[in-house]
From Swiss-Prot:
Monomer. Belongs to the NMT family. GO terms for cellular component: cytoplasm. It comes from Kluyveromyces lactis (strain ATCC 8585 / CBS 2359 / DSM 70799 / NBRC 1267 / NRRL Y-1140 / WM37). Its main location: cytoplasm. The lineage of its organism: Eukaryota, Fungi, Dikarya, Ascomycota, Saccharomycotina. The active site is at L447 (proton acceptor). InterPro entries: Acyl_CoA_acyltransferase (IPR016181), NMT (IPR000903), NMT_C (IPR022677), NMT_CS (IPR022678), NMT_N (IPR022676). Tetradecanoyl-CoA binds at Y38, K39, F40, W41, L171, C172, V173, S179, K180, R181, L182, A183. Keywords: Acyltransferase, Cytoplasm, Transferase. It catalyses: N-terminal glycyl-[protein] + tetradecanoyl-CoA = N-tetradecanoylglycyl-[protein] + CoA + H(+). GO terms for molecular function: glycylpeptide N-tetradecanoyltransferase activity. This is Glycylpeptide N-tetradecanoyltransferase. Its EC number is 2.3.1.97. Adds a myristoyl group to the N-terminal glycine residue of certain cellular proteins.
């Protein structure tokens, strides 16, 4: 089967997954058969597409750290394993170059993620991070980094159950080596290293369908600088509309509407308490301690921005955060980059004291989130971001349409490694539109 045919099948399966709202039993036998192409994942402790889940929990709990080999799998003769010391500027630079030249880009190769060194320091080194979980493959002769994968520690709550795990991210193989099947070997090696620490579960996300998503969310985009987005062909001019009309449609006030202000260290205790209480509603969520919350949320210039709203008594009632991950624009004479803001974590006390899905509680939260996220969009625009991205996770469905977020073409699938879990709502209906009624039970956000 050609790569093009495989891509088409993946696209078909992705659409089917959305239509069936994560109910994998609705796949036809032929569609399930197509999953046999995933030779690697068939050998891993993951939920199969045709598996009937009767009980949530670990799939394989028989192993112990002493059962795990002390040495990695052998590589082809031209390559060697390495542990990437991201505290070393030269080695961090190797990761930076590999990601920025070979990581995810759009199908037309027009846009590519541009991870800054500061962003990588933030994303790769949360509290408890381990150097040996930053795994690389180098060319023996030149020492050039051609493969990378990262694991960082995280404690998850999955429907009230504590799951000690890692987040897997930044899996990247040099474009010219994609046929060498380095990706499965990188996954096996980081799994081996994590298992030696007696950790057996992992959370990862991706745009392609693998066995077997626990949830799927849709991307949504809110233009902040429509004119630039049009110029770089990130967006198109709708039929029966003019550029002037589109610019006017997406124009935001010059300054925030509320008394929102930058979160400071002195706000952390209250914001952390608010965050924990708000996150209780979600079925898949992080269980941060205060140091982790501080690391992920406090503002770092050009990386992550966080803001709070206080009531008249000075109590923190809301906070919102977003991170900056620009695109490099390839072969464009006008612009070299596109500023992108990504919705991160937020919390509000607007519906505390109400049932989450009650009419009154829902309306109170909808109004508050519309104010909070609209101000976040204004702040992002003032930071020279050109578009604001959000998933349909958390309670985002309550504000996406109101604030002129348009549904994107992309979907993000959430996977739990070595853990069975009933499907979790992702904030989209069967027709793939925003599900304002059920919303999402995914509270965790991965970079």
């Amino acid at each position: 089967m050609s790569e093009e045919d495989k891509s088409k099948k993946l696209e078909e399966l992705l659409k089917l997954l959305k239509v069936h709202d994560g109910d994998l039993s609705k796949f036809t036998s032929q569609q399930r058969k197509d999953m046999n192409e995933y030779k690697f994942w068939k050998t891993q402790p993951v939920t199969k597409f045709d598996e009937v889940i009767k009980k949530e929990g670990p799939i394989d709990s028989s192993k112990r750290p002493e059962d795990i080999p002390d040495t990695p799998l052998p590589l082809l003769g031209d390559f060697e394993w390495c542990t990437v010391d991201v505290n070393d500027e030269k080695q961090l630079e190797d990761v930076y170059v590999l990601l920025n030249e070979n990581y995810v880009e759009d199908k037309d190769s027009t846009f590519r993620f541009n991870y800054s060194r500061d962003f990588l320091n933030w994303g790769l080194k949360p509290p408890g991070w381990k150097e040996e979980w930053q795994v690389g493959v180098r060319v023996k002769e030149t020492k050039r980094l051609v493969g990378f994968i990262s694991a960082i520690p995280t404690n998850l709550q999955v429907r009230g159950n504590d799951v000690r795990s890692v987040e897997i991210n930044f899996l990247c193989v040099h474009k010219k080596l994609r046929s060498k099947r380095l990706a499965p070997i990188l996954i096996k090696e980081v799994t081996r290293r994590v298992n030696k620490y007696d950790i057996w579960q992992a959370l990862h996300t991706g745009g392609v369908v693998l066995p077997s998503p626990v949830s799927s969310c849709r991307y949504a985009h809110r233009p902040l600088n429509w004119s630039k987005l049009y110029d770089v062909e990130f967006t198109a001019l709708p039929a029966n509309a003019t550029k002037t009309q589109m610019i006017a449609k997406y124009t935001l006030p010059k300054t925030p509407i509320s008394n929102i202000k930058l979160m400071e260290e002195r706000h952390v205790d209250e914001a952390f308490e608010l965050f924990n209480k708000y996150q209780q509603r979600f079925e898949l969520r992080p269980n941060f301690d205060k140091e982790e919350f501080r690391h992920w949320i406090l503002t770092r210039e050009d990386v992550v921005y966080s803001y709070i709203i206080e009531n008249d008594e000075g109590k923190v009632t809301d906070f919102v955060s977003f991170y900056s991950l620009p695109f490099t624009i390839i072969n464009n004479p006008l612009y070299k980059d596109l500023g992108i803001g990504y919705m991160f974590y937020y919390a509000s006390d607007a519906d505390f004291g109400y049932d989450r899905f009650s009419a009154e509680g829902t309306e109170r939260l909808r109004k508050r989130l519309n104010l909070l996220i609209n101000d976040a969009c204004i702040l992002a625009r003032n930071l020279k971001m050109d578009v604001f991205n959000a998933l349909t996770s958390q309670d985002n469905a309550l504000f996406l349409e109101d604030l002129k977020f348009g549904p994107g073409d992309g979907f993000l699938n959430f996977y739990l490694f070595n853990y069975r879990c009933f499907p979790i709502t992702g904030g989209i209906k069967e027709d793939q539109t925003f599900d304002v009624e059920k919303r999402s039970n995914v509270g965790v956000v991965l970079l």
